[in-house]
């Protein structure tokens, strides 16, 4: 992050704008939305700047720039067509620790003006760091279209009751829960419809309740999907942004964690092959204890929590402890990996059934019903099977599958790090070694793998 986004109090801010053409005028008009004092210096002024000066909204000096113009200024915009003058002002301002922006010249900018969605008192500011202005305009248009203009009324309503709510609830957590319920319920709807008197009465009624928060939290068992953040469900994202605490494992990507509420506590309990960071029974107890302390806890798991995610064990403990919970399904790794590798798990000409199995190696063996797994016209998917690949291939051949049976391994499915290696039961181990495949990787066995060459749409083979 080269540019750190901040919001500056403009009540006593003195701003200098050098230049008074159309470009400078746009900066002046933007500054006029604030409480800043604005001085403009230029040999001439366009009609807009001249009108604003005549109306007394800005101070205009119709002359050339002088170094003394920087005196007592905290912010400077430079918008002239004299490149040397722009450079000189940049260096002079920087030497005096005055923030300076030379319009459309990023190397000479100590700060940049963001793209703004204004719903005062709610302000959304975005920036591309000057590298993608067209994309930024596109995103702003999207936000403008989905955020109601009347959101500003909600901001004003919240400001009116802020101190009352603060006095009513003695903890930050209880206040946040209260406001989340208000903004997600009927009170907010009344405000957006312009029914302020009704909204205020409803607000007073809610504040008068004996106890808004029971003091008992809840656990949300959330499937984070196979890796790509775009594959999260809406509900998963909504709960992630409500959480007080997030308990996550190794398969949850950094990009997905970035979507969690910024000030939520994050607890890593990740498990890797041969290394269990936190025993499962301790994780189960941790979830219950956190919720019983009044927290909203998101248990974030890669894939789907009920498919080799041990979600059932975790909620059994919650039931025993009397903790409320919700389960949010996620796209399981098998579905994500197969889709992004161009391998349909079922196909009328290849597979009439699909079986999910764990390939986890224990004591150099995998205890599975191999005759059932080694069936023709079937797709078998092995989770956590990379280390056990030699055993899987040996057992499938031993129980009747030809060594020419197609097999594929998909590493880091649905992400930019995805790799796919395809082969057959006889040669796949060598191919995997040559490609340097690492966990997390999924194994797909069956003739559907032969369709990859035709159906692949996401990336190339490793």
From Swiss-Prot:
Residues 1-203 are annotated as: Precorrin-2 dehydrogenase /sirohydrochlorin ferrochelatase. InterPro entries: 4pyrrol_Mease (IPR000878), 4pyrrol_Methylase_sf (IPR035996), 4pyrrole_Mease_sub1 (IPR014777), 4pyrrole_Mease_sub2 (IPR014776), CobA/CysG_C (IPR006366), NAD(P)-bd_dom_sf (IPR036291), Siro_Cobalamin_biosynth (IPR050161), Sirohaem_synt_dimer_dom_sf (IPR037115). Residues 217-462 are annotated as: Uroporphyrinogen-III C-methyltransferase. Its EC number is 2.1.1.107, 1.3.1.76, 4.99.1.4. S-adenosyl-L-methionine binds at residues 226, 302-304, 307, 332-333, 384, 413. It catalyses: uroporphyrinogen III + 2 S-adenosyl-L-methionine = precorrin-2 + 2 S-adenosyl-L-homocysteine + H(+); precorrin-2 + NAD(+) = sirohydrochlorin + NADH + 2 H(+); siroheme + 2 H(+) = sirohydrochlorin + Fe(2+). NAD(+) binds at residues 22-23, 43-44. The modification Phosphoserine is found at residue 128. One of its GO terms (molecular function) is sirohydrochlorin ferrochelatase activity. Keywords: Cobalamin biosynthesis, Lyase, Methyltransferase, Multifunctional enzyme, NAD, Oxidoreductase, Phosphoprotein, Porphyrin biosynthesis, S-adenosyl-L-methionine, Transferase. It comes from the Bacteria. GO terms for biological process: cobalamin biosynthetic process; methylation; siroheme biosynthetic process. Pathway: Cofactor biosynthesis; adenosylcobalamin biosynthesis; precorrin-2 from uroporphyrinogen III: step 1/1; Cofactor biosynthesis; adenosylcobalamin biosynthesis; sirohydrochlorin from precorrin-2: step 1/1; Porphyrin-containing compound metabolism; siroheme biosynthesis; precorrin-2 from uroporphyrinogen III: step 1/1; Porphyrin-containing compound metabolism; siroheme biosynthesis; siroheme from sirohydrochlorin: step 1/1. It holds the Pfam family CysG_dimeriser. The active site is at residues 249, 271. In the N-terminal section; belongs to the precorrin-2 dehydrogenase / sirohydrochlorin ferrochelatase family. PANTHER family: SIROHEME SYNTHASE (PTHR45790:SF1), SIROHEME SYNTHASE-RELATED (PTHR45790). Then it catalyzes the NAD-dependent ring dehydrogenation of precorrin-2 to yield sirohydrochlorin. Finally, it catalyzes the ferrochelation of sirohydrochlorin to yield siroheme. This is Siroheme synthase. It comes from Pseudoalteromonas atlantica (strain T6c / ATCC BAA-1087).
